[in-house]
Amino acid sequence: AHKAAQHNDVLGDICLASRRVEKCDQIIDSVRRKKSLKDPSKKLYSRAVDALDIPALTKLIQDTRSEIVINLGTAYINMSVLEACLAAGVTYMDTAIHEDPAKVCEDPPWYANYEWKRKDRCKEKGVTAILGVGFDPGVVNAYCALAVKNHFDGIDTIDILDVNAGSHGKYFATNFDPEINFREFKKVWTWIDRQWVCKPVHADKWT
């Protein structure tokens, strides 16, 4: 929200939506307190909505005249938000693959399970869906592309490790949603030598 506010001269009016509108209002207060709103003439406001209620979410998108929906919710809501964007005819962005809460660690290729099945409908509706623009995938991909294009003559392998730096005084800190982290302990898929490999968690040790 802060980053979007910093670029609201391009993005225009911004609506934050969640089941609990109070959470959105706290974020808006933080944006205003830190003076993150680049163009104060643009609106920054909140609305309450259940993202799993596709008709209600579609109506909210239409009522707010939104042109882009940036989905920063749990991965369980990705497909309902995408369906609402298809119904409203607006651009969709998310930060991770969709997850079915009833299925733990589905087999890859994950995007083929849900997102790619809607590719033809996105094309028919003229809807752009930009997937996985969080950190991994997302920022990681951008750094890898930068390294390949500007810093190395050739790259054989790239190892991606999820780590935390520093200390905030807590015993355990997750890189992602804690539930997603624990689900991934059940089954671990890794891309090795151009193929998916399933191994037990912590099967490989780094020395």
Language-model-detected regions and their locations in the chain:
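Rossmann-like dinucleotide-binding core of oxidoreductases
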Residues: 122-207
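Helix N-cap at the beta1-alpha1 junction of Rossmann-like dinucleotide-binding domains, i.e.
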Residues: 18-23
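Redox-cofactor binding/interface segments in oxidoreductases and associated redox assembly factors
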Residues: 69-71, 93-94
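Conserved Rossmann-fold cofactor-binding substructure of NAD(P)-dependent oxidoreductases
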Residues: 48-66, 73, 77
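Rossmann-fold cofactor-recognition segment
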Residues: 34-53
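N-terminal Rossmann NAD(P)H-binding glycine-rich loop of SDR-like oxidoreductase domains
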Residues: 1-7
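Rossmann-fold NAD(P)-binding glycine/threonine-rich loop
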Residues: 87, 95-127
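Short beta-strand element of Class I
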Residues: 13-15
